[in-house]
A protein has these predicted regions:
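Acidic (Asp/Glu-rich) sequence patches and key acidic residues
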Residues: 1-169
Length: 169
């Protein structure tokens, strides 16, 4: 399970690729709930998906991905340092990938706060503290699987800055 955040109005250098070929999925014969990309359009759809992923990578505010292991520590940190930016509902809904929206103003303020903390060394200190805490957990403790990294914070800051607000999926 992962979290895919989509920019609501990302600042982009090029237009986002759009699929106009209708529903690409078709039911697999002999199954009740299994679907696949229609074999007749698979190559075309794969090309579209590749171009869309390239566009997302080239435009920082378009899409941000984290698996659940990386997302939770990041969101914990963000909610702690942005407690006067995010509402209680934002904080709670950020732990679920069900489409909660963070508006452009909040996204910009989150980015600004993260930049400040990146610059003043607060995030480096937090990463060191977090790593020490994780290393002291007992073997087999699932919390050892939740890493925190400055690079992840940096990428999230850039996403927030350029997203125009975002949805958490």
């Amino acid at each position: 399970m992962g979290f895919g955040l989509t920019g609501l109005n990302p600042q982009a250098d090029t237009p986002e690729p759009k699929w106009d070929g209708g529903d690409p999925m078709t039911k697999v014969a002999g199954t009740e709930h299994q679907y696949e990309v229609d074999p007749q359009i698979k190559e075309e759809y794969d090309d579209f998906m590749k171009s869309r992923m390239e566009w997302q990578e080239a435009n920082e505010g378009a899409y941000f991905r984290n698996n659940v292991w990386f997302w939770r520590p990041l969101w914990n940190f963000v909610t702690g340092c942005c407690d006067n930016i995010l509402t209680e509902r934002d904080v709670e809904q950020g732990y679920f990938n069900d489409g909660h929206k963070i508006c452009k103003t909040k996204a910009k303020r989150i980015a600004s706060r993260l930049r400040k903390y990146l610059k003043n060394g607060h995030i480096s200190a937090y990463e060191a503290w977090y790593s020490k805490e994780i290393s002291q957990l007992k073997e087999g403790d699932w919390n050892k699987n939740y890493p925190f990294s400055i690079q992840n914070v940096r990428e999230f800051e850039r996403f927030c800055e350029h997203s125009g607000g975002f949805e958490i999926w």
